[in-house]
Curated annotation (Swiss-Prot):
Gene3D superfamilies: Indigoidine synthase domain. GO terms for biological process: nucleobase catabolic process. This is Pseudouridine-5'-phosphate glycosidase. Its EC number is 4.2.1.70. Catalyzes the reversible cleavage of pseudouridine 5'-phosphate (PsiMP) to ribose 5-phosphate and uracil. Functions biologically in the cleavage direction, as part of a pseudouridine degradation pathway. Substrate binds at residues 86, 106, 140-142. Its cofactor is Mn(2+).
Amino acid sequence: MTLPLTFSPEVAEARAAGAPLVALESTIITHGMPYPQNLDTARAVEAEVRAAGAVPATIAIMDGRMHIGLTGTELEVLAQADGVAKLSRADLAACLARGGVGATTVAATMICAALAGIHVFATGGIGGVHKGAEDTFDISADLRELAHTPVTVIAAGAKAILDLPKTLEVLETLGVPVIAHGQDAFPAFWSRDSGLPAPLRADSATEIARAHLMRSKLGLPGGQLVANPIPEDAEIPASTLAPLIVQAQSEADAKGVARKAVTPFLLNRLFELTDGATLASNIALVLNNARLGAAVARALTT
């Protein structure tokens, strides 16, 4: 049985030429923001990758196939679609088998990227250990995927709504390299400094690429997480966000929001509580990660 992979013309041409490729997720399009802002942002992120010298490969499941790179029409269809499944490792195969449509989370995007031979993936922030996980056991599949699938993930750290100390502990237990780019502190998505030190630091895309290649040579499974801090002019201080996150989490608990619905609920409430500031910061950090992702992809191909 052949893999149900469909490459966009742009990605197919890049693969044939050995050009640098950067995978992009699709959950940010379907679950991250409303239309048409989601479409505009997706186009802007792809343009940022191209401007930085690489080829973007936005990944989504459509008609039961893994689409590696989306055409302009496909991107627009996905941006306006309703009821799109949010796919991770557990439900990716089932969606493909039934010929469904789905947006890929960090974990699912990593799987598809690896199958397509793409080694770098730029996203906003990874999932992790949710607050209260000692009772709910709500831990994102993204963490184990980082330990399993050989893709370097460029993100602004883990989402600030999570339990960041526990997230870092789990990543350490799983043997995942956590590398802060250009600073010693582990960033917290909308904020440059979480108050926690990053285990590792790299100051250039070349260093990050070399670490990726060395892991492969050593036969070590999994990828690496590159924590790229949000640009200074776009950050929201952690001290400003902390009480709002507590409020949003309390509301989620009161409403019985659970499992995959938790993150979208919290992000939406924080958007409302900050009068849209979190969304503006989110867009800025994704664009920043796209630029670094392109630089790492270029370094891997030289």
